Amino acid sequence: MTILEELNDSSIPQRLDNHIFFGSVHSLTHTDFLVENNIRFFINVDLSTELISHIYHEVRSKFAHEIVIVNIDNDSQIPIESDLVRSFHWHNTSLLQQLIHHLDFLSGINNHGEPLTPPPESHYRNAYVQFDHPSDSVSILDKLLYGNKSEYSRTNIFQVTNEAKFQVFNDLITIFKYSIAQGGNTNSNILVLSENGSTDENLISLLMSTVLKENPTFNVYQALQFVKSIAVIPDTVRDEKILWVTGFINYQELIKKNEMYWGLGSQKGRKLTSFASPISKVERKQRRRDDQNIMRSKLPQQRQNPFCSTERPKRARCD
């Protein structure tokens, strides 16, 4: 019995917006649905990389086109030595790398105003590609992402938690949606999967963060009601568990900073620091103001201008 046969049930993905579907891992058994809805991109949340690797090799042949699968898996014991996992990781990282480079090529600009020249196709068909982007070049994709674009070219397995998890999830959504828009195939779609679909608090909070990013004037309760209006969420899933998922509140503040305070794509609100490299497991540290670490320079005493003295002048005596 194959992995897909073991997972088989009646779960059908639900639609979040024009290009995003979501559901449980069982959705992968409905290959007819996936093909009919032209699912090209898969984002898996909190699923075993080993499980996804097995499923990938079973479903890949059922698609007439290449699919890209990424996995947000915080398991520190990913069996990368497994041939299936290694093949899954290698092939999808290459595709993701190729996709990002192609989007940069389509944007057509670098620091010198010259088009970026893509490498010959044979360079990236069956191997990792090391792209040399000028460090000071800024593409359209750079402006759309909250994180560092280069981090998404290095792997298709993202071991992140907390706020970094929300950032990686939404940056991947942005990359895939931008690819759909630039590729001219507006029928392509994204499928977001978790173990139990709409009964997973983590998945619901991630979907809410996407709604908030697309609608920054929404508050968190409006986002929750929107997701509830399109998803079948059982009563056992409590609102407070969704709203208080670790990192969700911090990511809401990051959305406001980027999308409202300084406008969409503004560089002012972006974190171009090590926080933009969550793949290397660098957790964002909350910076707290520590008065003991602030060096205070002694300010010079302001000299009083005699012409601006507030003291009442003495009248001259005429003796």
Swiss-Prot record:
Keyword Ion transport: no
Record has Nucleus as a keyword: yes
Compartment(s): Cytoplasm; Nucleus
Domain of life: Eukaryota
Annotated region described as Disordered, given as residue ranges: 281-319
Keywords in alphabetical order: Cytoplasm, Nucleus
Primary localization class, coarse: cytoplasm
Any GO CC annotation of this UniProt entry: cytoplasm
UniProt feature, compositional bias: Polar residues: 299-308
Note: Present with 1360 molecules/cell in log phase SD medium.
Protein name, per record: Uncharacterized protein YOR342C
Organism: Saccharomyces cerevisiae (strain ATCC 204508 / S288c) (Baker's yeast)
